[in-house]
Amino acid sequence: MINDGDMMALSGFTPNGNPKAIFRELSKRAIKLHDAGIPFQVGILTGASSCQSVEGDMAAAKALKFRAPFSTNKDFRTHTNLGEVDYEDMHLGHMAERLRRGFYGEIEWAVVEVSGMEEGESECKAFLTSAGGIVSTIVRLAKKIIIEHNQFHNPN
């Protein structure tokens, strides 16, 4: 489903609202692919820094090709300083505009953490967990959307 070279944009602002489970599994998949000699790296764009499963685990699995706009993760910094990850550090307020202007090419995936959903006949409503970040931009730009349901958060 997620392919080598895909650009992914995520919900959240700092670890709040970041999808977590998908990236724990994606880093495991990357390790298996690399062990089999198959390349696998993705680009990750967020509204701020993210969490260990997105930055640290993915960097340790050598599954990150590019990351922007900001990181506070020690494991990610280590791999970036080794030259394993291309990284762009910028003012967080510029990210959504740069996405809309196409600075990062096409966004294959928007990955959004939600606390619940309501399905209707003509529309669906997704309830974000604790922080949206750049969600309104990424869901419009992405070719495909993955929704990660975090049941720890109450949708009400």
What are these regions (language model features)?
Residues 1-156:
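Conserved alpha/beta enzyme-core scaffold
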